[in-house]
Amino acid sequence: MANYAVGDIQGCYKEFDKGLKKINFNEKKDRLWISGDLINRGPDSLKTLERIYNIRSSVNIVLGNHDLHFLARHYADRKAAKNDTLEELLSSSKCEKYAKFLLKQPFVFSKKIKLKNGDKKKYIMVHAGLPHYLTFKECMNLNKLSQEFLSKNPKKNLKKIFFHHRKNNFKIVSMKDKLTFFINAVTRIRICNKEGKIMFAFKKGLKDLPYNFIPWFKLKISALTRDDRLIFGHWAALNGKTNKQNIIGLDTGCVWGNKLTFVRLEDSKKYFIKKIK
């Protein structure tokens, strides 16, 4: 049995399928961790989601911002974005089934894994990152509440999530506002200042950091002990590089013409699938 992680498939089905073959993924024995953004912008969102759904008993998923965007388009009449490739999925007879499947998925997932050297290591998976001041217990509690919040009334609460997506302060009295901030933070964060204020609009690379802002993972992450490891996607401009041994970037920009990356968690071995032209 092995645990493999992959990030930001974004509907790049050919590369995803080739990657599963390259790692010899066995759905009866292995586990696949997907760090969000399963769909959108790539050419085969429906086919990708269908494949993941068919092996769902062998998959751990966290939601990403593109997954939320799809849910908002399906449930809350959110307008299409310029580069959306969701029409085939949205018009499919299976759309509601797949939407309900995604609504059940968490924003943060964690599990202990036995490494090849025999040690046990706790892995935490999130799409974009974690606010540095939240403890692991706080993150998992907010994750549970956020799942309940989203699934209870998808139409109303998805609108609230996207309406409040520019709020960047966790010091909010309302629990609903706190949950919408948490959801936006874990699915969108790239950079923040030393106090944890997030600049949600930033999408560039490390050479273009605004003054007094740093990558979120440069701060001491309260949820992460020195023995834990965290895996995330979302930030393609990093090309998977964080310069931190215990924080692993998975998004290597397949949808932008680069590659899809799989990581075997037991020994951190990486498998690369170049974009298929």
Descriptions of predicted regions:
Residues 3-10, 123-129, 248-250:
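Active-site-proximal beta-strand elements of phosphoester/diester hydrolases
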